[in-house]
Amino acid sequence: MATAETFYDVIRRQGITRRSFTKFCSLTAASLGFGPGAATAMAEALETKERVPVIWMHGLECTCCSESFIRSAHPLVKDVVLSMISLDYDDTIMAAAGHQAESILAETKEKYKGKYILAVEGNPPLNEGGMFCIDGGKPFVEKLKWMAEDAMAIIAWGACASWGCVQAAKPNPTQATPIDKVILDKPIIKVPGCPPIAEVMTGVVTFITTFGKLPELDRQGRPKMFYSQRIHDKCYRRPHFDAGQFVEEWDDEGARKGYCLYKMGCKGPTTYNACSTVRWNGGVSFPIQSGHGCIGCSEDGFWDNGSFYDRLTNIHQFGIEANADKVGMTAAGVVGGAIAAHAAVTAVKRLTTKREKADA
């Protein structure tokens, strides 16, 4: 029986040198935020471990997650799809169709029982027996449950699979339901966003492929490596928030100076994602940098939380945790107090010096 190829076997067959492979591991480890030692571990894993089979299924969705995924720059999606993993099924991009495509699902399920990753883009509608989404002549929810039975783990791509997204907006006539409410007995990695950042998606796949385990997840099931901080925490406009400098109207002086967009509805203070660090389009920019506030697309229920331009209320603390209307006055008061304190200390020092000279 032939041994399955590893990632290293594939790239060597493609003519890629050992030096280029090592460089790839170093760059990928750095892009994932790992230390220098991780590059060696990554190289060893990719040299010895078989490529992980991946089944990519689509429910109710717009395919924006796939559109984002194919634009990954670090690592390049071609390296992920053609070398790092074995993408055995994806009905959006595969050449096979009809019964031929369906037979691939059954073959992979049987051959790689307990070893394949089930990546799900979109969600199943449960109303009317799941008849609002038909795949291969069957309700998508049935197909999802069938493939989940023998999966090693499930990746829920995007806000649709993670939370429900716009198709679950009230009154949700199709009863569109997130994956974790349907599959209850498998580990599920939620990678929310509408869509998720490309490098976040490939980063999750790279981590599983390299280390043979799931990344550490937060209490909502999201990878901590990408969803542990609020966008607001690392936003380059954060100093303007702390200084009480806000855009009050589109195209006002504050907007032209790049002031904080909080009053224009920016959801950065309550949204956990890597937009302000990883950014989009190969690290070029992200919505706030382009002049538009965050809409909170990686948070549960963002589609039913009112207008994207409705301002968040009762944001507490200096920085994020104080009311924005009072931040400017507070900052001015703190600065004024500091100046007064400095003047008082200086006066005391001068008086003490004069007394010491007089006593001498």
From Swiss-Prot:
Lineage of the species this protein comes from: Bacteria, Pseudomonadati, Pseudomonadota, Alphaproteobacteria, Hyphomicrobiales
EC number: 1.12.99.6
Subunit organization: Heterodimer of a large and a small subunit.
Chain's role: This enzyme recycles the H(2) produced by nitrogenase to increase the production of ATP and to protect nitrogenase against inhibition or damage by O(2) under carbon- or phosphate-limited conditions.
EC class of the enzyme, as a word: oxidoreductase
Species assigned in the record: Rhizobium leguminosarum bv. viciae
Key words of the record: 3Fe-4S, 4Fe-4S, Cell membrane, Iron, Iron-sulfur, Membrane, Metal-binding, Oxidoreductase, Signal
Membrane topology designation: Peripheral membrane protein
Reported cofactor(s): [4Fe-4S] cluster; [3Fe-4S] cluster
Residues the record lists as binding [4Fe-4S] cluster 1: 62, 65, 160, 194
PANTHER family, per database record: HYDROGENASE-1 SMALL CHAIN, NIFE / NIFESE HYDROGENASE SMALL SUBUNIT FAMILY MEMBER
Protein name: Uptake hydrogenase small subunit
GO MF annotation terms: 3 iron, 4 sulfur cluster binding; 4 iron, 4 sulfur cluster binding; electron transfer activity; ferredoxin hydrogenase activity; hydrogenase (acceptor) activity; metal ion binding
Residue spans crossing the bilayer: none
Reaction equations catalysed: H2 + A = AH2
Binding site for [4Fe-4S] cluster 2: 232, 235, 260, 266
GO cellular component, one term: plasma membrane
Binding site for [3Fe-4S] cluster: 275, 294, 297
InterPro entries per the UniProt record, alphabetical: Cytochrome-c3_hydrogenase_C (IPR027394), NADH_UbQ_OxRdtase-like_20kDa (IPR006137), NiFe-Hase_small_C_sf (IPR037148), NiFe_Hase_small_N_sf (IPR037024), NiFe_hydrogenase_ssu (IPR001821), TAT_signal (IPR006311)
An individual GO BP term: anaerobic respiration
